[in-house]
């Protein structure tokens, strides 16, 4: 795995993969071009070609990209060829929605367990899962060898929960808590804060 590729480039690869999957599902063509992908995604064709060039040559001049092949290659680059088990921490409204979301499986992820510290939620069925007490978090994470977790909890408990997850072996975290998390080197953190996204857009209004 190359470590000198800008994170912003890595961040665009899942967008390309998603659009290639849509093209395949439409079933109208076997090949596409950087121009077509750019038009569909609002990204310049030059940017797409530059991004892909970090990982090799995937297309042919005059022919473009074979959709199936490029999809397979991007899946391999993103390590999505096998399914990743994911732990969800927080069984509130957001955790409930995540547990019922069917879009994870199609894209390489399976919600394997969900935790909460509320005794009224523990034991509740969410989708195909039973909410587990957070006191069992380390034991279950280690037993299932889970490397990916989603935090759907309030900000004041996000850091201590992050510490517990990392100590249990989690290497990648998606946090919905509106707070910066401190993690050791080698642990990836991404944030999803809709308020931040709205505030960014209001600058242009």
Label the predicted regions:
Residues 94:
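Hydrophobic/small residue at the entry helix of a nucleotide-binding pocket
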Residues 21-24, 129-204:
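Phosphate-bearing ligand-interacting subdomains
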Residues 1-29:
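Extreme N-terminal segment that seeds HTH/winged-HTH DNA-binding domains in transcriptional regulators
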Residues 91:
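Glycine-rich Rossmann-fold phosphate-binding loop(s) that bind the pyrophosphate
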Residues 105-127:
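NAD(P)-binding Rossmann-fold cofactor-contacting core
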Residues 31, 35, 40-83:
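HTH-adjacent hinge/linker in prokaryotic transcriptional regulators
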